[in-house]
Amino acid sequence: MAELACFCYPHLENDSYRFIPFNSLAIKCMLTAKVDKKDQDKFYNSIIYGIAPPPQFKKRYNTSDNSRGMNYETSMFNKVAALICEALNSIKVTQSDVASVLSKIVSVRHLENLVLRRENHQDVLFHSKELLLKSVLIAIGHSKEIETTATAEGGEIVFQNAAFTMWKLTYLEHKLMPILDQNFIEYKITLNEDKPISESHVKELIAELRWQYNKFAVITHGKGHYRVVKYSSVANHADRVYATFKSNNKNGNMIEFNLLDQRIIWQNWYAFTSSMKQGNTLEICKKLLFQKMKRESNPFKGLSTDRKMDEVSQIGI
């Protein structure tokens, strides 16, 4: 995750802003600079290589002291920054909006995946600039539309029906901020369209998850799609979701947290996110993740008959 201010800076032209991507040498210069505390939140002028991000975001970049940040010296950083600018420059951002826009925290890996989709000549985003820009504006939180299958970050499709598409995420192969844990495995489920879904299509998805992904929890980050993650990683997801939720509220980015369909979401996660939305502390919310929940009556009678026992998955074992 990183703020948009880690990728680009605003340049005032008439009554709105044009966004310009940072170059790696300007960032490198900022990372070595000594800057007064009062100037930590201001864009840094490297003198030689142009404007650089505010020094307060130093930890967002990979250095010899911090291996958890972005690999900003890669060509992928340039592609992601350019794509963000392309999307922001397609809309009008005024002086009253610019601080809010740049403070938004975005998924670096999501944006890299959109670059990969753009470069794939078989993908619809390769052929439609309008859909590409729409996908980016959704990814950076500027659009109120949810991420549907057409505008999704992408990956490898492992399941699809008339209402849902399930993707295996490919973060292990990334350049900008790769997942280093070789045991990482995670999925995302997007809606094919943002409209009411029939019970039969929900039932098909739940049957698939129950039989093929029984070692995983279905959660949501509140953005209109589902994530299918290992139970061992749920606490980590909870920390990130809570931090992003609080940060957005603090910066005035009052984004509605979408709890999604309670029949699909893991019970404990639904309790966690509901508690978070009520304003409870992280400690109180996280207790709900490890609490034994009363099993609700199965909304879909006879669901287990939809699959034969030899189809039960070994994924995640």
From Swiss-Prot:
| UniProt cross-references to Pfam families, sorted A to Z | Rota_NS35_C, Rota_NS35_N
- SUPFAM superfamilies per record: Rotavirus NSP2 fragment, C-terminal domain (SSF75347), Rotavirus NSP2 fragment, N-terminal domain (SSF75574)
Return the protein name: Non-structural protein 2
Q: Which cofactor does it need?
A: Mg(2+)
Q: Where is this region: RNA-binding?
A: 205-241
The UniProt entry lists the main location of this chain as: host cell
Enumerate the subcellular locations listed in this protein's record, separating them with semicolons: Host cytoplasm
Q: Which GO terms describe its biological process?
A: viral genome replication
Could you confirm whether the keyword RNA-binding appears in this record?
yes
Gene3D superfamilies, alphabetized? Rotavirus NSP2 fragment, C-terminal domain, Rotavirus NSP2 fragment, N-terminal domain
Q: Where is the active site?
A: H225 (for ntpase and rtpase activities)
Q: What EC number is given for this enzyme?
A: 3.6.4.-
List the keywords (alphabetical): ATP-binding, Host cytoplasm, Hydrolase, Magnesium, Metal-binding, Nucleotide-binding, RNA-binding
What enzyme class is recorded for this protein?
Answer: hydrolase
Instruction: List the molecular function annotations (GO) for this entry.
Output: ATP binding; metal ion binding; nucleoside diphosphate kinase activity; ribonucleoside triphosphate phosphatase activity; RNA binding
Family in the record: Belongs to the rotavirus NSP2 family.
Question: Which organism is the protein's source?
Answer: Rotavirus A (strain RVA/SA11-Both/G3P5B[2]) (RV-A)
Q: How does it assemble?
A: Homooctamer. Interacts with VP1; this interaction is weak. Interacts with NSP5; this interaction leads to up-regulation of NSP5 phosphorylation and formation of viral factories. Interacts with host DCP1A, DCP1B, DDX6, EDC4 and EIF2S1/eIF2-alpha; these interactions are probably part of the sequestration of some host SGs and PBs proteins in viral factories.
Residues that bind ATP: S107, V108, R109, K188, H221, G222, K223, R227
GO CC: one term?
A: host cell cytoplasm
Q: Report the domain of life of the source organism.
A: Viruses
